[in-house]
Amino acid sequence: MPALSHHHLAAPGVAPGDLALIPDFVEDQAEAAALLEAVLGGRQGGGGGPLTTPAPAPSGPGWKLAAGRHVRSVGGTVLGSVLLPSPLPSWATGLVRRLGEAGVGFGDGGGGAPSATANRANHVLANVYPAGAGILPHTDGPAYAPVAAILSLGEDSPAVMRFFTAGAGDGGGGGGGGAGGAAPAFSIFLPPRSLLVFRGAAYTAHRHGIAADVGGDVVDGSLLNPAAAAAWAAAAGAGREQQQQQQEEEGQGQAPLTIRRGPLRVSLTVRRVLKVRAGMLRL
């Protein structure tokens, strides 16, 4: 089991240890495909392999359409700042358990001993991104403990999460850029099967978002893990070389590194709602 403590990232304005990315949190591709199938309500991939083709609305209850994405919450409904709890499905309880084993705590201060019941996550939000979809820069708000863990699924669909200082990323151009074109404070390349964990100032003092895909995520100097992005681009080398050749033929010179997304990306955002309606469990 990968340990969170071995995968910290350094970012401006963020305390050491408050930002981490485990590249292969789900180490086995077949396991990731099975988890993705469970999340999507039993939708099958071709030949039992990774799910890489776009789908209509995922099957099963609870799915809603929001800003071009299909979303579903498990663990209960958040009304205001209070969770009306309901049982987590088995795939979510397994994920919460694995987060604890990896050292991810959801205490009131954004950490704490993962083994303590009070520090365990109680809510998971699934987002299904069709090709080209992003999410506006946002904060998750005070209803949750100040820590979020995001698991990325979809074998051919990496993404770049961009973080903006509070007030600089509240909308504008295309779904993941800062207001008025503000530059991100830092960005993180999210390969499939990776787990991003952020807490502290990364959670409370920054907005995070993913740009709408208008040809791919262009890698810039804000990226904290450029080597991982370059390795991914190299693995997808044929398309990259073709793009580069076309750029040179058109006299545009060296093309910037661009991360192409596949047709289906699913993220699982795991958090703990601080206030839970006592004595109420919706079945």
Q: Which positions does each model-derived feature cover?
A:
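Non-heme Fe(II) oxygenase metal-center motifs and adjacent flexible, charged/small-residue loops
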Residues: 1-243, 248-283
